[in-house]
Amino acid sequence: MLQKIKTFTTALAITAFSLTTQAQLKTPAPSPLQSIKQNFALSEIGIEYSRPSAKGRVVFGDVVPFGKIWRTGANSATKITFGEDVKVEGQNVAAGTYALYSIPNKDNWELMLYKDLALGGNTGEYKKENELM
């Protein structure tokens, strides 16, 4: 009887250890978060985005339809941070963080800086009045 208890306890310990070990394996994220900061003038510009994975799919024109607003990245909108006031396409842009949305088309893209960071990837609630440019 004592031998059966020892065998059962050993088997239970091995099972518990293997489950714990398996839980520690780190697998790559399907759409990994990326960020970069670059010195610019006397400050920095930073970009934070999740890189979409195509997984064998046609992304533009299929998963992301042409002519529709897109969050410009996976999971949530891409964020761009200007450490100081800048000019973009001749327009003044105040220092701060903005969401980057786009409208991809077959031959060109339209890019928009968006003031409401809480919108994230929910393009259904996109409001033109929150566009900076």
Report each predicted region and the residues it spans.
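Bacterial Sec-dependent N-terminal signal peptides
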Residues: 1-26
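Targeting-peptide/extracellular-domain and disordered-appendage signature
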Residues: 2, 24-94, 99-133
